Amino acid sequence: MTSRRPDSFEGLGYRGREDPAFSGGYSGRSFNNSSSSDLQNWVTTPPDIPGSRNLHFDDRTPQFETAPDEAQSAAPPSEQLNRFAGFGIGLASLFTENVLAHPCIVFRRQCQVNYHARCYHLSPMTAISVMYNVTKTQGPKALWKGMGSTFVVQGVTLGTEGIISECTPLPRELSHKWNPKQVVGHLVLKGLTYVVAMPFYSASLIETVQSEIIRDNPGILDCVKEGLGRVMGMGIPHSKRLLPLWNLVLPTVLHGILHYIISSSIQRLVLYLLRRRNNGSPKHSSPGSGMDTVQSMLDAYFPELMASFAASLCADVLLFPLETVLHRLHIQGTRTIIDNTDLGFEVLPINTQYEGMRDCINAIRREEGTMGFYKGFGSIVVQYSLHATVLQITKMIYSTLLRNA
């Protein structure tokens, strides 16, 4: 390997050479023939990096250690707080709607399909008492059954809606400048989605209301298998009272579209009123203060949560009688055994003989009275009371974190 050392390199004396191209007016300095005073003037601290920034005389580039602290102090924490707030609030809402509320949904459905029941559970106190007895007798899993199948049904619904909207001109969402044609197309898309998801919804309903005493441990995809089996007429044998799927299309689509219309209308109305109130309320704190930042972030997230909460509550309450009819038609002929909702210690079979939606409505009104459509209504009170409590706790925690940030 050849050396890269210059031929005339003689240690520090190499600095004594003069380059002809750059020697005009500048003489090279040598350590060998320089005095100590010259060395002190010539050997100084390294100059600042040229071109790094425009420096004046005696200016220095800030040290590397101080740069991160200045950058951190200059960066506002609002963006990180917004991300944390959005994730935390969304997670709390998802947990409340799909996990914490599931025992109330299970008990409500059992009450709706139990035509034997003498106690209608219109009050939340009686509902809580029987739910406690069921949990004490069958274990904590008794009121959490079928939760996986509900997620499967939600996934099938979202996937079907996306596929149909991509393959057809039906709009998946309505713009601000909508017209009647777009509204009709959007509702047709929703109706087709409910028709496709209907057999899987029926299988999920059976998993949620069937008693834990005689129930096996189904897999999370058994809902899909049972739904496809019901479409093709295969799978678990059913009785002759099982209604064909085309008889279930009208109540299923009617309930789904009405629920969507009511919830969407209430949500937009409540969101408009909340934002109008927040924009019209006077600001007592000075701009840029901590309280103003907290209030602005709360106004950005919680109106949507409150609007969604009010929309779901109104839709579930208004459509409770129709939901009772729908669940009784779906469960008929499936040889399902449910818990006795009067006491919570026994099981009962479902042996109804409805011929259709109109016959079911007339039979409930004739045999159980008008309040028979509201069996299990107390569980809705418990469900949305828990939901409101979680929202309030989340708001308090979030406000505390923002004030201490």
UniProtKB/Swiss-Prot annotation:
GO annotations of cellular component type: mitochondrial outer membrane; neuron projection
Stored SUPFAM superfamilies: Mitochondrial carrier (SSF103506)
Coiled-coil portions: none
Domain of life, source organism: Eukaryota
Gene: slc25a46
GO biological process: one example: neuron projection development
Protein name: Mitochondrial outer membrane protein SLC25A46
Cellular compartment(s): Mitochondrion outer membrane
Biased segments, Low complexity type: 22-37
Phenotypic effect of disruption: Morpholino knockdown of the protein produces embryos with a curly tail morphology and impaired swimming, suggesting dysfunction of neural circuits. Spinal motor neurons have shortened axon tracts due to degeneration of neuronal processes. Mitochondria in knockdown embryos show incomplete fission, abnormal aggregation and abnormal cell localization.
Keywords of the record: Membrane, Mitochondrion, Mitochondrion outer membrane, Repeat, Transmembrane, Transmembrane helix, Transport
InterPro entries in alphabetical order: Mitochondrial_sb/sol_carrier (IPR018108), Mt_carrier_dom_sf (IPR023395), SLC25A46 (IPR039158)
Membrane topology note: Multi-pass membrane protein
Stated family: Belongs to the mitochondrial carrier (TC 2.A.29) family.
Function according to Swiss-Prot or TrEMBL: Transmembrane protein of the mitochondrial outer membrane that controls mitochondrial organization. May regulate the biogenesis and dynamics of mitochondrial cristae, the inwards folds of the inner mitochondrial membrane. Could regulate mitochondrial lipid homeostasis and thereby mitochondrial fission.
Principal localisation: mitochondrion
Intervals holding Solcar repeats: 80-171, 299-401
Organism: Danio rerio (Zebrafish)
Sequence segments annotated as region (Disordered): 1-77
